[in-house]
Design a protein with these regions (language model features):
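Binuclear metal-dependent hydrolase catalytic cores centered on His/Asp/Glu-rich metal-binding motifs
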Residues: 109-159, 185-191
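N-terminal active-site segment of His-dependent metallophosphoesterases
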Residues: 1-70, 78-86
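Active-site neighborhood of phospho(di)ester-bond hydrolases with catalytic His/Asp-centered motifs
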Residues: 21-24, 45-50, 69-76, 98-101, ...
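Binuclear metal-dependent phosphoesterase catalytic core
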Residues: 2-15, 104-109, 201, 207, ...
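Active-site environment of divalent metal-dependent phosphoester hydrolases
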Residues: 26-32, 52-57, 76-83, 105, ...
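Active-site-proximal segments of metal-dependent phosphoesterases and phosphodiesterases across multiple
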Residues: 158-207
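Active-site-proximal beta-strand elements of phosphoester/diester hydrolases
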Residues: 16-25, 110-124, 161-165, 237-245
């Protein structure tokens, strides 16, 4: 999937914006990924979370990349630490690159990235103990308002991307749908309610061309085949699930493979 967004350059000239997107990492990020990015030279990198179960290696590596980065942490990034200390350390390492519940404008190249709720595990709305320890008892409506407020702060001349760990509710209730529950019967819509509500409200003020997320792995459980990873709704919003897991592999000739959505 090529993220072919349009970016304003001066008053009249426009060009395509090339964005690399790293799905759920699950500790699979190393020097080869960094070398690949240097060779591809994208305008920026988006990361949808589940970096490395609360460890600092990957957040530190992302912070040192020589290109614009926006990231939102996933449910595994709490490191099974209910005190929130592990989560706090990762947030500190990522600094302004983490855009959960916030806005990160990448200048250059000229892209407004708004983050969804950090550390979500999907399934409607729920805050883990680690999230409550770090952010307090944020209710559903407040989460919606945080996402909307961040989007409305964005420069209207910049293309807008919503970056989340779990995608929104409303994309289907079958196991193979972009946010469909595949690990337990019956299958159901496992998307985030707050993100879906935020998208609807943001549209009252500006278009939402692209929503990027992960969490729901492409390969379905129990031999269920492959998940639908891309769709477009009637309002023209594109939804891209980037959770190709594992993202490191080898081809039939034994050559290394590294997954990036593009």
């Amino acid at each position: 999937m090529e993220a072919s967004l349009k970016v304003q350059a001066g008053l009249a000239e426009r060009r395509d914006l090339q964005v690399a997107i790293a799905g759920d990492l699950h500790d699979q990020w190393d020097r080869s990924d960094e070398e690949l990015l240097l060779a591809l030279a994208p305008d920026g990198l988006l990361v949808v979370g589940d970096l490395s179960n609360g460890k600092g290696r990957i957040p530190r590596a992302l912070a040192q990349l020589p290109l614009p980065v926006a990231c939102v942490l996933g449910n595994h990034d709490s490191g099974h630490d209910p005190t929130g200390e592990s989560l706090t350390r990762q947030l500190a390492l990522l600094g302004e690159r983490h855009c959960g519940w916030g806005l990160r404008e990448l200048r250059p190249p000229g892209l407004a990235v708004v983050g969804g709720r950090p550390c979500t595990a999907g399934g409607g709305y729920h805050l883990s103990k680690a999230m409550r320890a770090v952010y307090g008892p944020v209710e559903l409506e407040e989460s919606v308002e945080r996402i909307c407020a961040a989007a409305l702060r964005a420069d209207p001349s910049l293309p807008l991307v919503l970056l989340a760990h779990s995608g929104p509710a409303g994309l289907g209730s079958q196991a193979r749908d972009p946010c469909g529950r595949d690990w337990k019967q019956p299958a159901c819509d496992w998307g985030d309610q707050d993100l879906a509500l935020a998208i609807a409200r943001i549209r009252r003020h500006r278009p939402v061309p692209l929503v990027v997320f992960g969490h729901m792995h492409h390969t379905l459980r129990r031999g269920g085949g492959e998940r639908v990873s891309f769709c477009r709704d009637r309002q023209g919003t594109m939804y891209l699930n980037t959770a190709s897991v594992p993202r490191h592999g080898v081809d039939l000739q034994g050559r290394a493979l590294r997954h990036l959505s593009w």
